[in-house]
Every structure is written in C-alpha cells, then in structure tokens.
Regions:
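Compact beta-sheet-dominated domain cores in extracellular/mature segments
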Residues: 1-131
Length: 131
C-alpha cells in the first residue's frame, strides 16, 4: 500500500511545465495541457498584484517544484515568486503568469483584455507581451 502512495507524492513535487504553441494570435506560452498563460501589464517585477476577486478570474499558474521548460521555452527565463499565501507562482522573464478561468486548451478568450486595472496579454517565447 505504501508503494502506491509514493508515486503520487513524488508527482506532486514535480514542477509545472511551460511550453510554446502556435495560437491564433501567434506563438505564445501555454502549460503542458495547452492552456494559454497570461501576464498582467501593471505588474513591474515578479511580485503579483492579483489577489481575491482578480485571482478568481485570473488564477495564478502555480508550481510545487521548479518550473520545467518545455518546447520553445528558455529555461533561464523561468522562475517563481512567492504569493502572500505562501504558494509558488511561476514567472517568465520576471512576469508572474496567470490563466484565465474560462479558457480551455482549445480556446483563448481574453487576449488583450482590460480588467482589474490593467491589460491581460499572452506571453511570447522571448518573455514580452504579445500585442
């Protein structure tokens, strides 16, 4: 019984994979499942400004381990920041990363949307906002 619990425990410590895929907006960062990730343009540096209602609409991309660089992603640009609740949020080129709550791997709904005092944009492989 203990052996069965061990793989699940070690899988939980794995880092979140970020990779590049071609979207209808151009090449952009996505997670392993193909779900788009965004940056929030009012954030300067790795500290998240999106909490409470904002984080319910734009959940942070979290990781339990070191984030993993998938296809097209620069390993050196991946990092983490610690949120107020102690969870680790994935960053890329210094930008905290987020999902949009209603996106799916097949559908990007909120590219270049203004909400919560800033603009939400997909992230290019070089770490800049896709405009």
């Amino acid at each position: 019984m203990q052996a069965a619990a061990e793989p699940a425990k070690s899988a939980a410590k794995k880092g979140t994979t970020i990779k590049v895929e071609r979207t209808k907006f151009g090449k952009a960062l996505v997670n392993r499942a193909g779900r788009a990730v965004y940056l929030f343009d009012i954030e300067e540096g790795p500290t998240s400004e999106c909490y409470d209602e904002c984080a319910r609409a734009w959940p942070p991309v979290l990781t339990k381990g070191k984030p993993l660089a998938g296809k097209g992603v620069s390993k050196g640009k991946l990092g983490t920041t610690t949120r107020r609740d102690g969870r680790r949020q994935v960053t890329y080129a210094g930008h905290p990363l987020y999902f949009y709550v209603h996106d799916t791997p097949d559908e990007i709904l909120c590219q270049d949307v203004v909400e919560f005092g800033g603009r939400w944009l997909l992230v290019r492989p070089n770490g800049t906002a896709l405009r």
